[in-house]
Regions:
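N-terminal export signals
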Residues: 10-31
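Short, well-ordered beta-strand elements
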Residues: 40-51, 72-77, 101
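Extracytoplasmic/periplasmic substrate-binding proteins
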Residues: 49, 61-62, 109, 219-224, ...
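Extracytoplasmic "Venus flytrap"/periplasmic binding protein-like
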Residues: 64-136, 171-173, 275-276, 283, ...
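Hinge/lid segment of periplasmic solute-binding proteins
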Residues: 106-161, 302-304, 372, 384-385, ...
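Long, aromatic- and glycine/proline-rich binding clefts that accommodate carbohydrate-like moieties
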Residues: 139, 304-305, 355-411, 436-452
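Extracytoplasmic/periplasmic solute-binding protein
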Residues: 147-155, 160, 186-240, 283
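Glycine-centered hinge/linker elements that transmit conformational signals in sensory
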Residues: 191-198, 236-267
Length: 452
């Protein structure tokens, strides 16, 4: 594979702006003594974006790998989450300074110029270390396939969830005999549940928190419920917008109703929903990464996938995945060790599940240990009804699609725009994005081979 034909300005514009360029050197290279100082025969340079609890879990998994594979030294570097990470990874891949192994959100893979900034995985080498396609959810595995080649190996899916407090729901008569929230199958049932829960909620607390002014969360929730309605985005060729404004309006009206009916307080912004939940609010919609937070707070709670208010189960999902940043001379012991390390972590993701993520490697999900994990065992079904962003270059976590469309959803949810007008604006933005060229390679979605 030849050197990618991308210049510095294209990369910076694509991945997040010129402001991060000056910080490229130090964070990407990591700190401390070289990993080969341990006396190991092979070194693997590994970049990730995991901080907080995820960071601790990843370090524990890397230490386990080091103990089991003393001949392989892992030099890991943690970079800033979001656009800075993707900028540095792109620049490294284009400048012959790429690590042997990296992590990306699956939704960003299509836009990362597979074949130019990412190298394809050797599926036979992965199989040698126990990672095979049949051990993964087909939808999830195929998200990493571009033009017939595998460019991303899924580690997990992370999903948006409906967290609920058992103490409040028990008082409201909303717990079943199994101690879980009563099932909800329609929008009317959901608002009936909120009405009953509100009557049992302590004064001064909102009934429901859902990050109403946050563009990312509102976009994620929109994706989930639009998918429940069977909504589509583009045709398979990536040449036509198929976005349904009537269905979009229905979703936007549903989101807005949480505020107009008095269940979500518009004066509470940011992470106030989680704080109120800890203090006794009955519901909050949050990502599964909040599991360790609520565990630490000693809250008696459960968590389900987002309610199927439009009849079909679908919960917004993204995925952390392992990738091979482009190296002109990829191959040899370091490349094989990168395959071995990725396979080891994917198969050993029981530890990773402690952070709330659902392991992508399905054999883990059937183990007795995983089945005992709560509330993980309550929402594991989300693996089989993932609502994902369209497979286009401008999608994915912190991507252009969320940046451009998310604020429109917020404007409807918070009341500064009417839902039907917001839906039309969303379609207009989708039309513009579809015709826009990816700065990574100068191709539109139609030219980029977006269909797996």
């Amino acid at each position: 594979m030849g050197q990618p034909g991308l210049n510095r300005r294209q990369l910076l514009a694509a991945a997040g702006g010129l402001a991060v360029a000056g910080s490229f050197g130090f964070a990407a290279l990591g700190t401390g003594a070289d990993a080969l100082a341990s006396g190991a025969d092979t070194r693997v340079r590994y970049w990730n974006l995991f901080s907080g609890g995820d960071g601790y879990n990843m370090i524990a998994m890397l230490d386990a790998f080091r103990k089991d594979n003393p001949d392989i030294a892992v030099k890991d570097s943690t970079l800033q989450w979001g656009s800075p990470f993707y900028t540095k990874l792109a620049m490294a891949a284009a400048g012959s300074r790429a690590p042997d192994l990296g992590v990306m959100h699956m939704g960003r893979v299509t836009g990362f110029s597979p074949g130019r900034l990412l190298d394809a995985w050797d599926v036979d080498l992965l199989a040698k270390y126990g990672v095979r396609q049949q051990d993964f959810n087909p939808q999830l595995w195929n998200r990493g396939v571009i033009d017939g080649e595998l460019y991303a190996v899924p580690l997990d899916i992370h999903v948006q969830l409906c967290f609920y407090r058992r103490d409040v729901l028990k008082k409201a008569g909303l717990l079943g005999d199994d101690g879980r929230m009563v099932p909800v199958t329609s929008a009317d049932e959901w608002f009936d549940v909120l009405k009953e829960a509100k009557a049992a909620t302590k004064k001064g607390l909102q009934t429901f928190g859902f990050w109403h002014s946050d563009q990312n969360f509102q976009w994620w929730f929109f994706v989930a419920f639009y998918t429940q309605l069977g909504g589509t985005w583009f045709n398979d060729a990536g040449t036509e917008v198929t976005f349904d404004t009537d269905k979009a309006t229905q979703v936007l009206e549903f989101l807005r109703r949480h505020i107009t009916d008095g269940y979500a307080d518009p004066n509470f912004g940011g992470g106030a929903g989680a704080e109120q939940f800890v203090n006794g609010s009955p519901f909050v919609w949050e990502g599964n990464w909040s599991v360790p937070v609520f565990d630490a707070a000693k809250v008696d709670y459960g968590a389900t996938p987002l309610p199927p208010v439009f009849g079909k189960q679908a919960t917004h999902a993204e995925s952390h995945a392992f990738v091979l940043p482009h190296q002109a001379d990829r191959g040899g012991p370091a490349n094989e060790a990168a395959h071995q390390l990725a396979a080891y972590i994917v198969k050993d993701a029981q530890q990773w599940a402690l952070g709330g993520h659902i392991p992508a490697y399905r054999p883990i999900l059937s183990t007795a240990a995983y089945k005992k994990m709560t509330p993980q065992n309550e929402y594991v079904s989300a693996m089989d009804h993932q609502a994902t962003e369209p497979k286009v270059w401008f999608a994915g976590s912190t991507g252009i699609l969320a940046q451009d469309i998310g604020p429109i959803v917020v404007s409807s949810t918070t009341g500064s725009a009417k839902p039907d007008a917001a839906a039309r604006r969303m379609k207009s933005e989708l039309t513009r994005l579809l015709a826009t060229k990816n700065p990574m390679d100068g191709r539109t979605a139609a030219q980029g081979g977006a269909v797996a």
